[in-house]
Amino acid sequence: MVIIGPRGPGSQRLLLSLLLLAAWEVGSGQLHYSVYEEAKHGTFVGRIAQDLGLELAELVPRLFRVASKRHGDLLEVNLQNGILFVNSRIDREKLCGRSAECSIHLEVIVDRPLQVFHVDVEVKDINDNPPVFREREQKVPVSESAPLDSHFPLEGASDADIGVNSLLTYALSLNEHFELKIKTKKDKSILPELVLRKLLDREQTPKLNLLLMVIDGGKPELTGSVQIQITVLDVNDNGPAFDKPSYKVVLSENVQNDTRVIQLNASDPDEGLNGEISYGIKMILPVSEKCMFSINPDTGEIRIYGELDFEENNAYEIQVNAIDKGIPSMAGHSMVLVEVLDVNDNVPEVMVTSLSLPVQEDAQVGTVIALISVSDRDSGANGQVICSLTPHVPFKLVSTYKNYYSLVLDSALDRESVSAYELVVTARDGGSPSLWATARVSVEVADVNDNAPAFAQPEYTVFVKENNPPGCHIFTVSAWDADAQKNALVSYSLVERRVGEHALSSYVSVHAESGKVYALQPLDHEELELLQFQVSARDAGVPPLGSNVTLQVFVLDENDNAPALLATPAGSAGGAVSELVPRSVGAGHVVAKVRAVDADSGYNAWLSYELQPAAVGAHIPFHVGLYTGEISTTRILDEADAPRHRLLVLVKDHGEPALTSTATVLVSLVENGQAPKTSSRASVGAVDPEAALVDINVYLIIAICAVSSLLVLTLLLYTALRCSAPPTVSRCAPGKPTLVCSSAVGSWSYSQQRRQRVCSGESPPKTDLMAFSPSLQLSREDCLNPPSEPRQPNPDWRYSASLRAGMHSSVHLEEAGILRAGPGGPDQQWPTVSSATPEPEAGEVSPPVGAGVNSNSWTFKYGPGNPKQSGPGELPDKFIIPGSPAIISIRQEPANSQIDKSDFITFGKKEETKKKKKKKKGNKTQEKKEKGNSTTDNSDQ
């Protein structure tokens, strides 16, 4: 507290002192205030918020608080005005005893950010304690033979105050025999003594009663008094005398009880009772309840009873006297100073305050976690404390002020590795042996969203049968997040995109919590073979993190499409077909051909033909090819055969269960000379067969040249486009693929516009031209860089027994068939190898497996039992079209061979049929001529 008085030299000195004090405070980084003890509640101490540079408005939000280690309730801060005031009674004597300096150390703590300020409040003494004597009356025996100027020490008064307030002034009541003299000791303390100025006469004055008054130096002055009773003794003119006027003893504070302190010795030259000495303790300063001293009255030995504590009192002053037994007795006085040496008997104390828990996982290095204070009541090296922390932790201790430390973050935290730390703070003093204490600090790491959900693998393949019920569960995705609580709460969603003309969400959906993927509508293999999409997993953190997984859903084919009959030149699709057959044709003559197509794939699209039992009679001279659908004569027709035959042909696929369709063929037998215009096989140029044959050959040559030229031009254009186009990677080309196969007898081509092809990329559709040669496995690189030498066939490949029946008939590809490539592309192998055959002389091949999935092998192999091995550049007789078990014959025939080259099935759109009508007309005319000559064409070769 600053007190302003009248101006003058004293006030100038006071002002200078205050300026020096303020400069010292700025240099030390602390605030210093002062307050008088016994101040009333609410007494102003200082504007602590203003002095610390804090705004009043931020005291409450920043949790402004004052902490004191032992005296937290004496002072308080008003958070409204930032004033430090007295909260409860301050007693300096109780707080600091007789210490010259007395202050209250405060810690001012504010958060956001965490700051600590140190404030010292000096407690100033006031004169609130009067000087007192230990006893109300002091008895002083004085021999009447005492010489003048004899000194008689008196017991002085004590004042609990300090400084000026404890400066004592003694005064003695008026008398004619004694005067008062003040004796100053080495420690600057004073001791009152009576000095004899006039000889005593016991007979005249046996007793004297004096009043000793004491006045302190405070304002206002406080006084005390004691009665001095002087007894005049008879002549015993020699009093006891100690060897030394004072003694000094040094003891360790850990001495045992009943330890001897010192052996005193006093002597009296008198004889008899006047020479017998009795020892006693007159006074012990300071007074202690723990430690007591006693003296043997006969021997003068002083012993200690109790415990010495350096931290309580580091020195004791024992005033002893020696009294003889003379009458009157005389006394000698001495003083024993006992100094206490400190030993390391106090364990350091550790106090953890202001914990900022939990600690965020992304907290910056240097963030203050807690404040730690240590103390040791010992002195010197025994009281010097060093703190240490548990090793190998991302924290460290930083000394801030004297015995104060800050626990700060030393390196980055990772909750996923360690979610909590048990720290041990060890405080060790410098004693020998050193003492130590520990304090445990539990630091919990709070999670932040720093880990994205992760899937077990980046891509999943799912197989789903078509015609599934709406809402069926097809797959479950699961992602794991290493974070905790809401940061690990994963939700799933579709990565929306377009699938053709529809949104992805119209096909599938994903449950946000479970990750279950559902098909919202029945899938159709014929429309959608592969559905590729992404599922996103996101956590609930802020900001949310996520990752994607790719799902490839392959739609497996089911036998849900019955064979469909194709239109013929003589009738519409599904209607009856009329054919005229001359009676002169021989056995094996092709009468008609039933053409059908199945929208399914694999076994489900593998068609077989048979005559219905109702249409089979004992004398019916016709049969149908099992896989070709060609109706041919079984023998030479004669007059006994009925002129009209109604044939019912059953077309059946190989699905489970099999689906069928029925075609009706009306066959009329006519004489050789008849050529009705209604016959589907009639030719306009039948009047001159030789001229018609020449015209047909010319047309055939022109058609073959045109097709070959178109093929070469297409290949050149395709190669030029591929070489000039920039290299791009496309997962899927949903365009219109074109397949061209070459053989010695010509070329056949296939072009099919897919209904819908789904892929994950956004690349534009491409039109691919795929050229295949038997016994060669093609890839994209093979098309651009053809090998110099053809590959040798694998001799381990065999035909299956189920297809041996088809080995004797060639499948002629026309516009009725569908040729598919599986979802894996032409590089995938068709698993058709079967080495377990009972007939080693014949090769085997198995039909497609898996309903069209992974059935894209274009490699043709012959077993070792087959005597024909294709050499380089040679072509095999038959090969398998992927997606269909049909066996394609490309055997080269002689130039004069009369093969019906029109019976060649291609799988594609119906528009392909129109392109080949002209070519068929020439073949039909030639066939009509051959029938007239009774020659046999076997198209099964």
Curated annotation (Swiss-Prot):
5 X 4 AA repeats of P-X-X-P, as annotated region = 734-885
- Quote the Gene3D superfamilies the UniProt record gives: Cadherins
Q: Where do the Cadherin domain residues begin and end? A: 30-133, 134-242, 243-350, 351-455, 456-565, 581-678
Give Gene Ontology CC terms. Answer: plasma membrane
Q: Where is the composition biased (Basic and acidic residues)?
A: 900-914
Annotated signal peptide: 1-29
Ranges per topology, Extracellular = 30-697
Gene Ontology BP term (one): homophilic cell adhesion via plasma membrane adhesion molecules
Q: State which ranges are Cytoplasmic (membrane side).
A: 719-941
Q: Which residues are glycosylated?
A: 257, 265, 548
Residues annotated as transmembrane: 698-718
Q: How does it sit in the membrane?
A: Single-pass type I membrane protein
Could you identify this protein by its name?
Answer: Protocadherin alpha-12
> Which organism was this protein described from?
Pan troglodytes
